[in-house]
Amino acid sequence: MRLLALSLSLSLLACRSRDESDPETWIRRLDDRDAKIRVQAVQQLRKLKAKQAAREVAALLKDPLVKEDAALALEDLGGRGQVDALLDAVDTTVGAGSDAAARAANRTNARIAEALGNIGDPRAGPALLRLARATDDTVRLAAVEALGNVKASEAIPELSHIVDDAAAPPLLIKRALVALGQIGDPAAIPALTHGLVIERQGVSFLPESSFALFLIGAPAVEPLMKIAQDQDPGYLAWAKENNRAPAGTYAKTALVLGDIEDARAVPVLLAKLKYVDSDPVPGTSRLLSNLVKMFAANALGRMRAVEAGPAIQALVSTINPQDEDLTTLAAEALSWLGDRAQARELMKKAQKGLVKQRIVVAQAAALFGEPALGNELATLATRESKGSPPACVRQLGELALSVDDPRQACGLLAAQFSELAKPLDAARVCGAEAPCWLMRMQDPDPDVRARASYELGRAGSAAAVPMLAGAAADEQLLVRAAATRALDWLAAVPAAQPALKGIAPQLASQLAQEQGKTRFLKANEELRRLQVKLSRL
């Protein structure tokens, strides 16, 4: 008898457990007389992702004791059928009060805005626009984000006002810029160009503004070119009023023009390679001039504007430490252009000067130069190995390297150059054979993997797409950058486009997983743009 009772108890517990995982159990409790049970039912349905309960949950928006939880649940459960109920539930009378009722009403309005944004129905635009003007910051943040999700073009004036409002919180400005990009209307371009250069409370909005302009794409090219050439009177007046330096404007417009990759911008960018800032302090003038030049060079490299090669080469210097960043970006741009003659010029410059810049230049040359450059690297390394130990120790220090025995310093310094011969050795073996370069994608040396990525991209190898997609997640930033560029180049190859579109979800997943990882921040900004480009194929 005791065993029978125990068996019956266990059976009842199992049934109860199964019942609580069944949405119907909780749907039946939504009209319970006890408000606590109704709230619990809504919460459980949200946990169970029971979208079939959306209609019943939406009905509880009229229940003041359950309204907030119902709105929260509809963020996950709601669909177009719940839009009207959510709109009716918006409290347009609440202010920014600190009493419990006002706080609850504002929390509920924020959750309604989030639910409407997640649903993405344009009918929500007018209500969200009203909420974007609320006095409560939480409500405004949720509403502004939702306006982007529903692509409410009628909100562009309000969102633009937020961007230009000096009193607006930085986070709200960021949300407004993102929303303008999602809406994708060229009417947002003036506000977005302001966003490129403004700062609020020490916060830059360049990432959000540049990406939003990238999303708008071709319609942004002419306005950006006019700004870069001081041909937009409205922008000039705004920049003067807001004390925005020309160099920052030129550099950041060049950045976006490079993202969009529209050939119309090439002449404008070529002109910026010769920019000289008018600041009376020579050091500041050089710094600002270099800023504009390196962004212009980077943009021309992205666009593979081969005609820019000699002008970009002229920016490469191993002599002045102030030119380190400019040299790095210019050398990288030359590796993207892929003109082998420019690699020979880079290797000549690597023969003398500051060691950090020499290695940057030699590495760039090794990523696209002819195999014969390996002989020059070997000669260079031999010369370094015969240097004086004190000089070698000093140069290793500039590279953040150390050695216990100074007598070994010159050997270690020479190795920094000789190691760069590996991608040139691979080029000697592979030549223009894509299958050979595909095998090199698994090479233990990151320089070889980077060179293989570039070679496959230049060759238009559709078969390389899966391997390159994997390399876009490589731990080495050099390899990531090369794989991202190669995939971008392949987007112009019709045979590669189906495979490229197929990897867009994979790249989106990678971006989500790596969000917040500062080491990959810059690389993933590039990958983010690539993912959008591929998803649009």
State where each predicted segment sits.
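Sec-dependent N-terminal signal peptides of Gram-negative exported proteins
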Residues: 1-16
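Structural detector for internal amphipathic alpha-helices that build alpha-solenoid repeat scaffolds
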Residues: 15-19, 36-50, 56-59, 67-80, ...
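Bacterial Sec signal peptide processing site at the extreme N-terminus
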Residues: 16-28
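Alpha-solenoid HEAT/Armadillo-like helical repeat scaffolds in large eukaryotic proteins
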Residues: 25-29, 56-64, 85-100, 127-135, ...
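Substrate-recognition/specificity elements adjacent to catalytic centers across diverse enzyme folds
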Residues: 310
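HEAT/armadillo-like alpha-solenoid scaffolds in large eukaryotic assembly and transport factors
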Residues: 497-500
